[in-house]
Amino acid sequence: AYPDSPILVSAVTVGGYNMAKQIIQEADAIIYFPLDMPFVSESFVKRIQPRIFMPVETELWPNFLRAIRERNIPVMMVNGRISEKSVKTYRYLYGIWDDMLNTVSRFCMQSSIDADYISHLGADPKKIYVTGNTKFDQTYAEVTPEDLENYKKELGIENAYPVIVAGATPVSYT
């Protein structure tokens, strides 16, 4: 068990990979997730031999999950989320979704809406928990002037405008 178990983190996008390298320093390795093709998934799972698979958000890949299930490796979705649009699309893929959802032993969803959506797709309600968005639990490094300029560009904020950030702090934190 952790901390004696190695941690392998995978990402699908370049942005996800770079973010993982920046904020998950406990990982023993960070890789790009393998293509979800039967041979590739089988080979990867056989080589890595994971003790547990924890997909983040809704990264469920049918061939990979099949390879995991065949080896009785537990699966727990963390920070699960699913959009209304995705629910409408996914319900037409019932056979595939039913198979994938039955492989997952715990669904830790961001919100009650996400929990309802995953239940609507066929996940067992007894396996669904609302745990909140774990991205809010992260601590980030100081923002560099370059990062600040990039954020301003992304948000369309010009330098002349003041920026007000409002938040709430629970009484238990003070």
Predicted segments, located by residue:
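A short helix/loop element that forms part of the nucleotide-sugar donor recognition site in Leloir-type
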Residues: A141-G156
